[in-house]
């Protein structure tokens, strides 16, 4: 089972209804089924991606993403906190959330200002996931970012085309 399962509803919403609708969909779907790890991952990644793009990416404020930044902050923080408590040892959670925490720990409402500690926590999560799933190319590619032997994802690794899948394809291919 892939870490990011194909999500046709999410892909459709991102294209037809926009980022805010996609964020609301993933967040509400996860709240309705909190113990579903895929729903948790999708809620967290959608919030993280929109937050990152609103601050640093090509979308910028001109596309209205600043209006959903508070929602993103809340959704990402809640998903991360819940995930740490309930899925903290699951390699799928560790790999994806570890990456997001490593890059932008200040996206968390419980971020205490210690960037290095939280970034290292994210790195440790990725490496722990890699130990558990040594043969998973996605997790290996995330872990290899910290070594001289970079691993690239094959172009056809992801089945879907959601924003986060496109992001990871661009970053890891």
Regions found by a protein language model. Give the residues of each.
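Alpha-helical segment of the N-proximal tetratricopeptide repeat
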Residues: 5-25
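Amphipathic alpha-helical repeat scaffolds of TPR domains
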Residues: 1-11, 32-62, 88-108, 135-152, ...
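Generic detector of contiguous secondary-structure segments
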Residues: 24-38, 76-88
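Short coil/linker segments at helix-helix boundaries
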Residues: 20-24, 46-82, 102-132, 146-162
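Terminal, non-catalytic domain-edge segments
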Residues: 157-173
């Amino acid at each position: 089972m892939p870490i990011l399962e194909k999500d046709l509803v999410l892909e459709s919403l991102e294209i037809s209804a926009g980022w805010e609708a996609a964020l609301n969909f993933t967040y509400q779907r996860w709240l309705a089924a909190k113990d579903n790890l895929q729903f948790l991952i999708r809620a967290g990644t959608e919030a993280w991606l929109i937050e990152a793009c609103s601050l640093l990416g090509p979308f910028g404020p001109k596309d209205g993403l600043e209006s959903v930044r508070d929602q993103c902050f809340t959704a990402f923080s809640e998903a991360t906190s819940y995930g740490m408590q309930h899925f903290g040892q699951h390699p799928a959670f560790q790999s994806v959330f570890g990456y997001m925490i490593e890059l932008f720990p200040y996206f968390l409402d419980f971020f205490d200002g210690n960037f290095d500690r939280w970034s290292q926590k994210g790195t440790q999560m990725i490496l722990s996931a890699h130990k558990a799933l040594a043969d998973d190319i996605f997790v290996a590619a995330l872990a290899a970012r910290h070594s001289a032997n970079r691993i690239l994802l094959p172009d056809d690794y992801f089945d879907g085309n959601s924003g986060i899948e496109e992001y990871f394809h661009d970053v890891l291919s």
